[in-house]
């Protein structure tokens, strides 16, 4: 720590910071534009000027840029000196000479950093009376609106997009006072993280186009801390609502997960929550096939009669639903009748992952920690498409060597102006094994393209080369043997090694082979730091599997063999998992089927009793991410408040009410805390989830935490078009939040789940500075989430039961999955804007096969699989090996059951 003097006051600050960051960390406001905690310092805007003095006798001092000045012990500076105040005000005035006077119609108004800084420097009168420079705006795609005339040339956008995210289709053009930030020509931004430009831009150059369609100011929305449900990373998000619709999703700071960035799917893929076609009332199909709309009590009565009529009812849960909902279903049908909805293949993968996490003497890094590794090996995962935020972290890890070089020469971490020159020459090692090309190949030192079986063989060879107790592989060619020696040497000689794999290939063997490599490194060098990241396909795959249960194949088999009489699906679409033929056969009789869901899935439409449930924005619950971190998401609004005819309930409420009526007992789950207490008592692994911080009884100074900013307006007229009498605001009995602007909303050590970032004078996302102990580091309250797996010190043996297959010429075509960020995740497929931007379905075929068959791009291929005919255009891959065909697994018509199936004729 260093001691500095600021306007005659003494502060102890972090000596590794620059003066700007140090002052912000101790609560001193200095205006800035080009600096950002994520991007470091550039010194481009000259806005953060302060006066520095040589000693206490110096009365004149000199102007310095605080973002480019390192902290030195005993430094004497003034922020309030007349010279620095006049200078900062003049800089804002200069920046505004070409800035339009359009705050009232700008989407950034109300959470604009430029507005905040203008107020901070007390600039209120413009002296510029001449014509303003104007630019033509570009079309940047359906998600981001471009308004170049608002630009102040802070360079944040190009530094993030090109230097941080490695984007290549965005840049800066021009010179002097006439620069342009955009693409060479109109077009959709290619980066999967382009949406972060919206929050990083301090003005309104880049704004959320999806929000603009139904716009509200920041202070007029109701927020709740949420968890992104689109993959297993579990990024923290802030969800904004108005008039019963989700209007905007923003990044919610979490130091060890997403910090300042989320992917575009998490930011823009929410419109399925607003669909008017969503089920909102219970329905019942009688014996005459008539559809009847029910009220709550009628639906419960039919549900109770259903369970009394059938002896054994199978309950099928879902990995896209919370632990609470799955547990409620398990309690209703019994543990022996419960299925978590996973296929046999996926279940084996998740079991292996859980076994490893429970015995994790090998380190499990957080998303942020992935950025610190110097050698990374990725096996069987297309990270950019399946876990995009992990791919961005891997990109930072490859560039981490730049910081090592800077440390060698004493260049501070925050001084990023030299990064681009160093990074071209020095990079860390990334090795990838996959079936076909991925978007990380551009930074990979070596990519190996082969079938899953061959990937397992190569991974096992690496493990054997490191430690001879691993399974031995024979028949590797000489070129691959050289690569095995190279990679094994790099893995063992690095400072920190990371192995990444997961369940998206539906191969248990690739997961075990990945773990074997990590174990082999630990056996050979016990003090070597090695980490393992194992990704799953859904937000709560680990949570669902911890509850146990049979596979979906076993459940359907029991129903076909009449070992069970009926089934209840909870937020689960059978058509996504099982072949269409099997589904149609199964749904011939709908009398024995109940479905709960918040989307009109094909399964929901074919049920006897259909119960509408709340989605992740309308309910609260717990999910577990890939590292075993249990995280709570919170209800944003009450959907029944805006439309009293709605009959939407949390799935656990439907299920528990039915169970209570069947057993003629009193309802004992009155709120979410009661459900958590029940499963924490039954499953010891969940005991840590029961924490006082998340208890619904938590109060700060006697107040609940407000979901809305204090300036929220129009509450009394929200429903005036329906009824002029203002109804009572809904009461949230499940959480510590209030559906109101009345309550506590300031930084506090008791609350790590923050609905929105706001602080007096700080309305933009830069307000997160005020919620952190030190700017860019941990929150005052600490990170949210609880690691449920304890550190395990005892070493375990390598997997010796991996099936190693020799290379043989394939007779049939083998189906493998390919993924796209937009289109493969289940719920976002219902989102209209995601549908518009989903690539068309195609069959991916290797170049050698295409040449043999005389196929080229967009040629049509036909085949039959799982008793269904397919007709698809062809896309040709340079690297896909012979007799492999890639299909868009997870999309409508392409169930998970297709993976690994064989096609005889193509």
From Swiss-Prot:
PANTHER family per record: NADH-QUINONE OXIDOREDUCTASE SUBUNIT G (PTHR43105:SF10), RESPIRATORY NITRATE REDUCTASE (PTHR43105)
Protein name: NADH-quinone oxidoreductase subunit G
InterPro entries reported in the protein's UniProt record: 2Fe-2S_ferredoxin-like_sf, 2Fe-2S_ferredoxin-type, Mopterin_OxRdtase, Mopterin_OxRdtase_4Fe-4S_dom, NADH_UbQ_OxRdtase_75kDa_su_CS, NADH_UbQ_OxRdtase_ferredoxin, NADH_UbQ_OxRdtase_Gsu, NADH_UbQ_OxRdtase_Gsu_4Fe4S-bd
Residues involved in [4Fe-4S] cluster 1 binding: 99, 103, 106, 112
Free-text cofactor note: Binds 1 [2Fe-2S] cluster per subunit. Binds 3 [4Fe-4S] clusters per subunit.
Record-listed [4Fe-4S] cluster 3 binding positions: 228, 231, 235, 263
Subunit structure of this chain's protein: Composed of 13 different subunits. Subunits NuoCD, E, F, and G constitute the peripheral sector of the complex.
Known function: NDH-1 shuttles electrons from NADH, via FMN and iron-sulfur (Fe-S) centers, to quinones in the respiratory chain. Couples the redox reaction to proton translocation (for every two electrons transferred, four hydrogen ions are translocated across the cytoplasmic membrane), and thus conserves the redox energy in a proton gradient.
Source organism per UniProt: Buchnera aphidicola subsp. Acyrthosiphon pisum (strain APS) (Acyrthosiphon pisum symbiotic bacterium)
């Amino acid at each position: 720590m260093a001691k500095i003097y600021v306007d005659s006051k003494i502060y102890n600050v972090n000596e590794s910071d620059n003066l700007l960051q140090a002052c912000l960390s101790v609560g001193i406001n200095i205006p800035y534009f080009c600096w950002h905690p994520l991007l470091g310092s550039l010194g481009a805007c000259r806005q953060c000027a302060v006066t520095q003095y040589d000693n206490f006798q110096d009365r004149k001092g000199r102007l310095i840029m605080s973002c480019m000045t390192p902290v030195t012990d005993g430094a004497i500076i003034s922020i309030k000196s007349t010279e620095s105040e006049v200078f900062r005000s003049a800089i804002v005035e200069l920046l505004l000479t070409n800035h339009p006077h359009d705050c009232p119609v700008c989407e950034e108004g109300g959470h604009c950093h430029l507005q905040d800084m203008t107020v901070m420097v007390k600039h209120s009168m413009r002296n510029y009376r001449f014509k303003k420079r104007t630019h033509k705006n570009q079309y940047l795609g359906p998600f981001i609106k471009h308004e170049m005339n608002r630009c102040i040339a802070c360079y944040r956008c190009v530094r993030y997009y090109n230097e941080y995210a490695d984007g290549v289709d965005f840049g800066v053009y021009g010179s002097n006072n006439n620069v342009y930030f955009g693409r060479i020509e109109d077009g959709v931004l290619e980066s999967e993280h382009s949406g972060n430009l919206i929050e990083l831009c301090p003005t309104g150059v880049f704004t959320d186009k999806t929000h603009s369609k139904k716009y509200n100011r920041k202070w007029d929305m109701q927020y709740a801390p949420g968890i992104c449900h689109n993959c297993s990373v579990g990024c923290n998000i802030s969800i904004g609502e108005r008039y019963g619709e989700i209007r905007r999703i923003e990044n919610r700071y979490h130091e060890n997960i997403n910090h300042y960035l989320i992917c575009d799917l998490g930011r823009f893929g929410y419109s399925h929550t607003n669909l008017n076609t969503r089920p909102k009332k219970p329905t019942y199909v009688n014996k005459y096939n008539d559809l009847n709309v029910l009220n709550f009590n009628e639906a419960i009565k039919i549900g109770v009669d259903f369970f009394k009529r059938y002896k054994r009812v199978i309950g099928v849960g879902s990995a896209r639903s919370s632990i609470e909902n799955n547990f409620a279903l398990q309690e209703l049908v019994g543990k022996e009748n419960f299925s978590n909805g996973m296929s046999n293949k996926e279940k084996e993968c998740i079991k292996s992952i859980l076994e490893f996490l429970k015995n994790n003497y090998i380190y499990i890094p957080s998303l942020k920690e992935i950025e610190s590794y110097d050698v990374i090996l990725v096996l069987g995962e297309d990270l950019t498409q399946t876990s995009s935020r992990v791919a961005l972290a891997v990109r930072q890890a490859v560039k981490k060597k730049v910081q090592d070089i800077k440390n060698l020469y004493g260049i501070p971490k925050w001084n990023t102006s030299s990064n681009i020159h160093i990074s071209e020459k020095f990079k860390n090692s990334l090795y990838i094994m996959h079936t076909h090309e991925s978007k990380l190949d551009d930074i990979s030192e070596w990519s190996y393209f082969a079938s899953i079986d061959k990937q397992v063989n190569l991974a096992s060879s690496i493990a054997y080369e490191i430690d001879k107790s691993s399974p031995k592989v024979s028949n590797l060619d000489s070129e691959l043997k050289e690569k095995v020696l190279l990679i094994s040497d790099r893995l063992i000689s690095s400072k920190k090694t990371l192995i990444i794999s997961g369940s998206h290939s539906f191969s248990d063997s690739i997961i075990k082979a990945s773990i074997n490599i990590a174990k082999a490194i630990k056996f050979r060098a016990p003090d070597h730091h090695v980490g393992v990241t194992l990704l799953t396909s859904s937000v709560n795959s680990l949570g669902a599997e911890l509850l146990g249960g049979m596979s979906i194949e076993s459940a359907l088999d029991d129903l076909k063999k009449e070992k069970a009489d009926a089934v209840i699906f909870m937020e689960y679409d059978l058509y996504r998992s099982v072949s269409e033929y099997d589904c149609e056969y199964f749904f011939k009789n709908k009398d024995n089927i109940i479905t709960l869901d918040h989307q009109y899935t094909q399964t929901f439409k074919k049920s006897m009793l259909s119960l509408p449930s709340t989605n992740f924005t309308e309910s609260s619950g717990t999910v577990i991410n890939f590292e075993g971190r249990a995280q709570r998401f919170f209800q944003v609004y009450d959907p029944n408040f805006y439309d009293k005819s709605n009959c939407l309930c949390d799935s656990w409420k439907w299920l528990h009410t039915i169970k209570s009526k069947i057993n003629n007992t009193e309802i004992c789950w009155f709120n979410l805390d009661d459900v958590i207490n029940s499963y924490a008592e039954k499953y010891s692994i969940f005991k840590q989830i029961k924490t006082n911080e998340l208890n619904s009884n938590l109060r700060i100074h006697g107040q609940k935490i407000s979901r809305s900013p204090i300036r929220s307006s129009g509450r009394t007229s929200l429903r005036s078009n329906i009824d002029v009498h203002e109804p009572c605001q809904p009461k949230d009995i499940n959480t510590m939040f209030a559906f109101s602007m009345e309550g506590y909303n300031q930084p506090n050590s008791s609350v790590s789940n923050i609905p929105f970032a706001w602080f007096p004078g700080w309305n933009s996302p830069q307000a997160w500075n005020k919620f952190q102990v030190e700017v860019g580091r941990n929150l005052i309250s600490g990170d949210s989430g609880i690691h449920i797996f304890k550190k395990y010190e005892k070493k375990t043996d390598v997997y010796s039961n991996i099936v190693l297959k020799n290379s043989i010429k394939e007779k049939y075509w083998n189906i493998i999955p390919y993924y796209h960020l937009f289109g493969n995740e289940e719920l976002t497929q219902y989102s209209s804007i995601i549908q518009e931007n989903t690539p068309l379905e195609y069959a991916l075929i290797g170049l050698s096969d295409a040449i043999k068959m005389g196929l080229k791009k967009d040629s049509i291929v036909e085949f039959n699989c799982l008793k269904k005919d397919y007709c698809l255009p062809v896309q040709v891959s340079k690297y896909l090996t012979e007799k492999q065909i890639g299909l868009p697994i997870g999309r409508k018509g392409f169930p998970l059951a297709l993976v690994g199936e064989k096609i005889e004729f193509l």
